[in-house]
Amino acid sequence: MKTAVHALSPDSRPETQHQTRKNEEAAPGSPTPRAGREGRKGPASILRRSPQERCGRGDEPRRTTRHVRFREPLEVAVHYIACREPTTAVQAPSRPRPRGGSLLLRLTACILLALALGMCCGQAGPMARALEDFRARLLAALLRLPLAALDCWRCLLQL
C-alpha cells in the first residue's frame, strides 16, 4: 500500500500511455479525441450498460432493469409500521344489553355454588339439600330459557 508521501510526489506517478488533449490537438494527423477515447479502459460508470445489455436481439432494443440498492434498516421499518394510525372503520350500532344478564353465566354460577356447597358439607344430609336447591335453580333457569330466546329474536328483528 502506498503511503501519502509517495502518492503526492510527482516522481511516483507513472507516465500515461495516452496523450493529453493539448498534445492531441497540437499533433498533426492524429486521430480525433473521441476515437481515441472509445477503445481505452476506464473506471466503470454507474450509468454504463452491462455487456449483456449491449448485445441486443436484432433491431429491438433491450429494456434496462433498475435495482434499488438502498433498503431501510429493519428497526426503522418496524417502527414505521407500529406508528401507523389504524384506519377508521365504521362501527356497527351497539346491541342493547340483556336486562337479566347472561343465562349461561347464571347456570355456571349455580353449578359452582352447588359444588362449593357440596365440598364444604361432607355429610350426606347437607349435600342432599344442596342438590335439591341446585335442581330448583336449574328448573327455574330452564323455564326462563324460552323467554330469553324470545327476547333475542325480538332484538334481531329490530336490527
UniProtKB/Swiss-Prot annotation:
UniProt biased composition (Basic and acidic residues): 12-25, 50-63
Domain of life of the source: Eukaryota
Chain ranges passing through the membrane: 107-124
Keyword ATP-binding: no
Subcellular localization: Cell membrane
Pfam families for the chain: DUF4658
A single cellular component GO annotation: plasma membrane
Region Disordered, residue ranges: 1-67
Keywords from the UniProt entry: Cell membrane, Membrane, Transmembrane, Transmembrane helix
Lipid bilayer topology: Single-pass membrane protein
Entries under InterPro entries matching the protein: DUF4658
Keyword Glycoprotein: no
Name of the protein in question: Nutritionally-regulated adipose and cardiac-enriched protein homolog
Origin species: Bos taurus (Bovine)
Gene it is expressed from: NRAC
